[in-house]
């Protein structure tokens, strides 16, 4: 597998052009892997808070008039802000406290999908005109983008935030700060601000096509089988030919 270490000016990571990837502070350390950290606790709290607020929004019921910004939708917007703010906070805490773990990254990715699905299902329930754009977006975010996001597990990096050592283009277009904003925030903001289902459909379809292109690029890079897989006790069960049983 070929690793890339480049600095094209768009990245602010602690490495220099031509650096040896092995020297970069991006690799997971099994001695520091654990389930509960300050960051994962924040992940659990912000996820629970978001889902509870969405539940209250749905309990408020569908508005009886044509009011767009109904009390229920306002609660959904609050849930969305809690999700985004919490997602930013847990990442910052993990990095600043040096508690980044692959477990935490995976929990964060899964929690993002849970919060996002809850918000968008609530939005489509309140405003059925958004159903098609929402379905397109969730197909992109919960299936294709989810697969892209967990692809880092095939390497020993700590999270997708360090995917630039595998492929700088995939990283820059998916997990740089501008890319995260476009993928996570643009669609929701446009729907809520413009109230235009057709525009949401165009954006969602565009994101879907783009993520499929990223999936094709990832397939060309290839997903290696991580070393260290096998029986939980580390013993090597093999066949007569020496292959894993």
Residue spans for each PLM region:
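C-terminal membrane-associated helical module and adjoining short loops/tails
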Residues: 1-36, 152-245
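Juxtamembrane helix-capping/reentrant segments at transmembrane boundaries
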Residues: 32-36, 90, 94-115, 162-176
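Membrane-embedded alpha-helical segments that form the functional core of polytopic membrane enzymes
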Residues: 35-103, 135-136, 200-203
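Multi-pass membrane catalytic core of lipid/isoprenoid biosynthesis enzymes
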Residues: 38-45, 49, 96, 100-150
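Core segments of transmembrane alpha-helices
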Residues: 43-54, 111-120, 173-192, 207
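Transmembrane helix-loop junctions and nearby membrane-interface residues
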Residues: 54-61, 120-127, 146-149, 153, ...
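Membrane-helix interface and helix-disruption motif detector
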Residues: 64-68, 127-130, 194-199
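Alpha-helical transmembrane segments and their membrane-interface exit regions
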Residues: 81-87, 139-148, 207-216
């Amino acid at each position: 597998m070929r690793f890339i270490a480049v600095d094209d000016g768009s990245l602010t990571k602690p490495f220099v052009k031509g650096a040896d990837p092995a020297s970069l502070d991006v690799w997971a350390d099994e001695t520091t892997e654990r389930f509960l950290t300050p960051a994962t606790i924040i992940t659990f709290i912000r996820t629970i808070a978001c889902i509870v607020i969405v539940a209250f929004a749905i309990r408020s019921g569908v508005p009886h008039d044509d009011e767009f910004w109904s009390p229920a939708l306002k609660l959904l917007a609050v849930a969305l802000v809690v999700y985004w703010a919490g997602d930013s906070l847990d990442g910052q805490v993990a990095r600043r406290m040096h508690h980044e773990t692959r477990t935490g990254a995976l929990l964060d990715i899964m929690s993002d999908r849970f919060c996002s699905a809850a918000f968008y299902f609530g939005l489509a329930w309140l405003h059925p005109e958004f159903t098609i754009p929402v379905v397109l977006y969730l197909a992109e975010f919960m299936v294709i983008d989810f697969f892209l996001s967990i692809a880092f597990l095939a390497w020993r990096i700590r999270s997708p935030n360090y995917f630039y050592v595998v492929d700088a283009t995939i990283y820059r277009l998916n997990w740089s700060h501008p890319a995260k904003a476009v993928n996570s925030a643009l669609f929701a903001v446009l729907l809520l601000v413009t109230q235009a289902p057709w525009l949401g459909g165009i954006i969602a379809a565009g994101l879907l096509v783009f993520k499929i292109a990223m999936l094709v690029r990832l397939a060309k890079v290839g997903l290696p089988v991580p070393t260290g897989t096998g029986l939980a006790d580390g013993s090597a069960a093999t066949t007569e030919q020496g292959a894993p049983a």
